[in-house]
C-alpha cells in the first residue's frame, strides 16, 4: 500500500505541473504554447531595450560604413532603431557563439537577428496560446485566426523578405524612421503601390477603420436608456447582463434608410464576422504581397504605356511614380552602388563602329 501511495505522489508532481500550466483558473493563462512564448518574448524584449539604448553602430551594407542606431550613439526616439544584421552575414545563422568576439557580433548586427527570430517565435506561440485557451474554454478558434494576420505581416517583413532578397540586411529596421526608410526603399525597388495585394491591404485597413467607427457610433447612438439625463449612459450597463444594451432594430433601420436597406446587417453574428474578416483578409493579402515581392514579383509597371500617333510618350501618373522610384533608389545605400539597380541592369549600348 505504501508503494502505491509513493507512485501516486511521484506522478502527481508532473500532473500538478500540467494542471497548473493548462488551468483556466489562473489570473493569466499560460498554456503549453506559453511555456515557449514567455522566454522568447522576454529575450526579444530585453535585447531590444538594451540594444536600442546602447548598441554600437552596425555595418549594415557590409562596406565598412557603420550606421548608428542607439540612443547612446546620438539618436533620439524617432531616429533610433535596431540596425539589421550586416549584408556580410547574409542569411547565415549568426548567434553570439558564431562570432570571434562580442564586439564583432555587435558590429555585424547580431542583436537584430536574435530579436527578430525570438520575436517571431514568440508571437507565433502567442497565437497558439490564443487557440489553446479558446479550446480549453469551449470557444471557437477565430481569435487566433484573426491574430494570424499581424503575425503573417511581421513574418513577411522580418523573415520572408530577407530570405527572398538574400540577406537579413534587407529586413525592416526596428525603429520609427527605420520603418519609414524600409517603406520608401521597398517602393523604389518593388513598386508596391502598384501591387494589387497592397491595394487590398489598404482597403482592409482603411475599410476596417471605417466599419469599426460606423459600428461603434451606431451602437452608441442606439443605446437603450437606463439612466437619467444627469448620469453617464455607460452607467446603464452591468457586466454580464442578459438584456440587450442597444436596439439593433433601431440601428438597422437608421442605417438602412441612410444608405439603402441591404447595406445594413440584420444579423448581429454575421455583422461581427464581417467586421473581423474584412481587415484580417486585407492584411493577409498584404503579407502575401510582401512575400511575393520578396522574390521580385513586383507591382504593375505601366511606364510609358501611353503614346501619341507619332510615338511620343504622354506621361501618366505611372511615369511620375517611376521617376520618384528612381530618385529614391539612387539615394538609398549611396555608397554601396553607383546606379539604381534598374539602370545598372540596362543593356549597354553598342560601341562597334
Swiss-Prot record:
GO CC term, one of those recorded: chloroplast thylakoid membrane
Topological type in the membrane: Multi-pass membrane protein
Source domain of life: Eukaryota
Catalytic activity: 2 a plastoquinone + 4 hnu + 2 H2O = 2 a plastoquinol + O2
Residues the record marks as site: Stabilizes free radical intermediate: 190
Keywords carried by this UniProt record: Acetylation, Calcium, Chlorophyll, Chloroplast, Chromophore, Electron transport, Herbicide resistance, Iron, Magnesium, Manganese, Membrane, Metal-binding, Oxidoreductase, Phosphoprotein, Photosynthesis, Photosystem II, Plastid, Thylakoid, Transmembrane, Transmembrane helix, Transport
Database matches in Pfam families: Photo_RC
Residues binding a quinone, per UniProt: 215, 264-265
Enzyme Commission designation: 1.10.3.9
Post-translational modification: Tyr-161 forms a radical intermediate that is referred to as redox-active TyrZ, YZ or Y-Z.
Annotated Fe cation binding sites: 215, 272
InterPro entries on file: D1/D2, Photo_II_D1/D2_sf, Photo_RC_L/M, Photo_RC_L/M_CS, PSII_D1
Residues with site note (Tyrosine radical intermediate): 161
Binding site for [CaMn4O5] cluster: 170, 189, 332-333, 342, 344
Chain sites annotated for binding pheophytin a: 126
Positions of the propeptide segment: 345-353
Protein family per UniProt: Belongs to the reaction center PufL/M/PsbA/D family.
Oligomeric and partner information: PSII is composed of 1 copy each of membrane proteins PsbA, PsbB, PsbC, PsbD, PsbE, PsbF, PsbH, PsbI, PsbJ, PsbK, PsbL, PsbM, PsbT, PsbX, PsbY, PsbZ, Psb30/Ycf12, at least 3 peripheral proteins of the oxygen-evolving complex and a large number of cofactors. It forms dimeric complexes.
Protein name: Photosystem II protein D1
High-level lineage: Eukaryota, Viridiplantae, Streptophyta, Embryophyta, Tracheophyta
Gene, per the UniProt record: psbA
Amino acid at each position: 500500500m505504501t508503494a502505491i501511495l509513493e507512485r501516486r505522489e511521484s506522478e502527481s508532481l508532473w500532473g500538478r505541473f500540467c494542471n497548473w500550466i493548462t488551468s483556466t483558473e489562473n489570473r493569466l493563462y499560460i498554456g503549453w504554447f506559453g511555456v515557449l512564448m514567455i522566454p522568447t518574448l522576454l529575450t526579444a524584449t530585453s535585447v531590444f531595450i538594451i540594444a536600442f539604448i546602447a548598441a554600437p553602430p552596425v555595418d549594415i551594407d557590409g562596406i565598412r560604413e557603420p550606421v548608428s542606431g542607439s540612443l547612446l550613439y546620438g539618436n533620439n526616439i524617432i531616429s533610433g532603431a535596431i540596425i539589421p544584421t550586416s549584408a556580410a552575414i547574409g542569411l547565415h545563422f549568426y548567434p553570439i557563439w558564431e562570432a570571434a568576439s562580442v564586439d564583432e557580433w555587435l558590429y555585424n548586427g547580431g542583436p537584430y537577428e536574435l530579436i527578430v527570430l525570438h520575436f517571431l517565435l514568440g508571437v507565433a506561440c502567442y497565437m497558439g496560446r490564443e487557440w489553446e485557451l479558446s479550446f480549453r474554454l469551449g470557444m471557437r478558434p477565430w481569435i487566433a485566426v484573426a491574430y494570424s494576420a499581424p503575425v503573417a505581416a511581421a513574418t513577411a517583413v522580418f523573415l520572408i523578405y530577407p530570405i527572398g532578397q538574400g540577406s537579413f540586411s534587407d529586413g525592416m529596421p526596428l525603429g520609427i524612421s527605420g520603418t519609414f526608410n524600409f517603406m520608401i526603399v521597398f517602393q523604389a525597388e518593388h513598386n508596391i503601390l502598384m501591387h494589387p495585394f497592397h491595394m487590398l491591404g489598404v482597403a482592409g485597413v482603411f475599410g476596417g477603420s471605417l466599419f469599426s467607427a460606423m459600428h461603434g457610433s451606431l451602437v452608441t447612438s442606439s443605446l437603450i436608456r437606463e439612466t437619467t439625463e444627469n448620469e453617464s449612459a455607460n452607467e446603464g450597463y452591468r457586466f454580464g447582463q442578459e438584456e440587450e444594451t442597444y436596439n439593433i432594430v433601431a440601428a438597422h433601420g437608421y442605417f438602412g434608410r441612410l444608405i439603402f436597406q441591404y447595406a445594413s446587417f440584420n444579423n448581429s453574428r454575421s455583422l461581427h464576422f464581417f467586421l473581423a474578416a474584412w481587415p484580417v483578409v486585407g492584411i493577409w493579402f498584404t503579407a502575401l504581397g510582401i512575400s511575393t515581392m520578396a522574390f521580385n514579383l513586383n507591382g504593375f509597371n505601366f511606364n510609358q504605356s501611353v503614346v501619341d500617333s507619332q510615338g511620343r510618350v504622354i506621361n501618366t501618373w505611372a511615369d511620375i511614380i517611376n521617376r520618384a522610384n528612381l530618385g529614391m533608389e539612387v539615394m538609398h545605400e549611396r555608397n554601396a552602388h553607383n546606379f539604381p539597380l534598374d539602370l545598372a541592369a540596362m543593356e549597354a549600348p553598342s560601341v562597334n563602329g
